[in-house]
Amino acid sequence: MSDLKAYLAAKYMSGPKADAILARSSDPTLKKKRKKQQTNEDYIGGSVKAEASGGLMLRDEDEVWGRSKNEDEEDDAPVIGKDLATFKGSKSSWATVANKSALPLPQAEPTSPQDIKPDIKEEPDIDGPAASAPVQMTKRRGGLRTAAQLKEDTERELAEQRSPSPAEGEERPDPTETVHRDATGKIIDVKKRQEEERIREEEERRKEAERKEWTKGMVQRRDREERRRLEKKMAEADVGRSKDDVRMNKEMKEEERWNDPAAAFLTKKKKKGPRRPKYEGPWAPNRFGIAPGFRWDGVDRSNGFEKKYFQAQNTRARREYEHNQWSVEDM
């Protein structure tokens, strides 16, 4: 404890107080005498003693006055200098943990005020001196610090608590932006909600256009697409067309007209595309001219009504013919 007082007096104090501390630390023979605890000596000792009777012991005032004067003179004996003031000894509150630690602790070297510097967290230089990371000060655990340093650290901590710095690559939030919440308190992203609404409206418009196309019929849609394709080809083709134009002649031959007299004996165009299979072979006629399916095995499993119906028609037609022939036989 005396070494600490001597170090502080040598480095940070001046005047008679510092001189007294340095003188006491340099001379081991000088020790400060502690004052004896004052007690009420009026009841201790004196010319009259009553120990036998168990009463109080009295002491003369002259004897007490002289003894207290001598004690004061003895207490003032080691005083050196003028207006001397010393540190009051106090019990240290630091706990030694050297016995519990297996690693040796480094000894702290005394430093001057010029050598005291803030602790700076060193980071590796990745991209050179131009891209070095910003200096970050760590929290100090102890040591002497000036009022300016304490004020600066306090202001910096308060600023970090009020507005924490965003992570790298993230945009700083706008403090003036309005925050919307739902009934449960959850934050609503207005931009995301608007984007979802726009996508939903586009999907509804597309479905509405598809429903309108469904009502127009497949044939009309196919004709429209064919006309659009033809117009595109005509826009790319030459303006002049002669009678030897192969494409024009082919289109005119493939076109069907309801009042064409040669449509009955001309070769009809073959329709391309998938076709349903048909039954190959003879089959009994019916009133509606419906052909059997291609999986029919040729066995008639009906009740015979169609067959009787055609026989009755043929019989009536034959009788009418015979009646007409008989009626004109005499002519």
Swiss-Prot record:
Disulfide bonds: none annotated. Keywords: Coiled coil, Cytoplasm, mRNA processing, mRNA splicing, Nucleus, Spliceosome. One of its GO terms (molecular function) is RNA binding. This is Pre-mRNA-splicing factor CWC26. The gene is CWC26. Residues 23-48, 98-261 are annotated as: Disordered. InterPro entries: Bud13, CWC26_splicing_factor. Residues 150-160, 169-259 have a biased composition (Basic and acidic residues). PANTHER family: BUD13 HOMOLOG. Residues 186-216 form a coiled coil. The lineage of its organism: Eukaryota, Fungi, Dikarya, Basidiomycota, Agaricomycotina. Involved in pre-mRNA splicing. It holds the Pfam family Bud13. It is found in: Cytoplasm; Nucleus. GO terms for cellular component: cytoplasm; RES complex; U2-type spliceosomal complex. Belongs to the CWC26 family. Associated with the spliceosome. GO terms for biological process: mRNA splicing, via spliceosome. It comes from the Eukaryota.
